[in-house]
C-alpha cells in the first residue's frame, strides 16, 4: 500500500540561518555543494526537480557534481551547511531550523502557504509504504496518520495536509508493535505522529528507525518492517512488487546565515 501522509516536500535550498532569502553578496570564494547519499529519497527528488540528471542508454543518471560533500541524513546536512558559510544543500521544509536559511525560488520564499498556493514550486511527495500483508496494529497506526488528529500534527510540523476533511481518529482493538523504517526526512514528523498516537492508543507501540527511502521501501516489501517511509515517488519496479504508497510535502534548499 502506498499513501501520501503529509503534503509537499518543498526543496529548501539551505545555507546558514532561518528560512527566508539568501543574500548572495556573502563571502567570496567557491561554493561548497553538500548533497545526500545514493538511495536518499531527498536526493532523488532534488536531482529530478532541478534537472540534475541526464538520460544515458535509456536510464536517467544522477549528474550531481563529484566535488559535492556527501551527508547521510538530514541532521548531518543541516549541521554541515550551518558550519560552512560558502555551502549550499537541501532539506525538507519541515526540517528547517534557525541554523540555516532557505533560498528563495523564483522570488518565492519557502513557506507552507506558498507551497499550498503553488507559488513555491519545488515540491515532492512524502509517502508511507507497506507490503501486501499488513498487521491490524499497523493499519490502526495508518488510520491515525490519515485522521484529522494525524493530519493536524503533520500541519503543525510545517507540512501540507493531504486531507482537509479527514475524520477524527477512533481507536480499534488492535494490539502489538509497529516498526516503521526509512527516510530521514520523513523520520522527524513520523516520530511526532508515533508519540501522539501511543498516548491515544496504549495497546500499541511504534518504533521508528531512520535510514533512507530505498531501505524503507525494500524493508516494507520484504516484510522486515510494517511501514516504510519514503521522501520520493515510488519507482515502477517497486509498485510492481505490490508496494503501496501516503503523503505529500516540500523540499527546501538551505545555505549559511550571513
Model-flagged regions — what are they?
Residues 4, 24-251, 257:
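Exported/periplasmic ABC-transporter solute-binding proteins
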Residues 4-24:
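Sec-dependent N-terminal signal peptides of Gram-positive bacterial secreted proteins and lipoproteins
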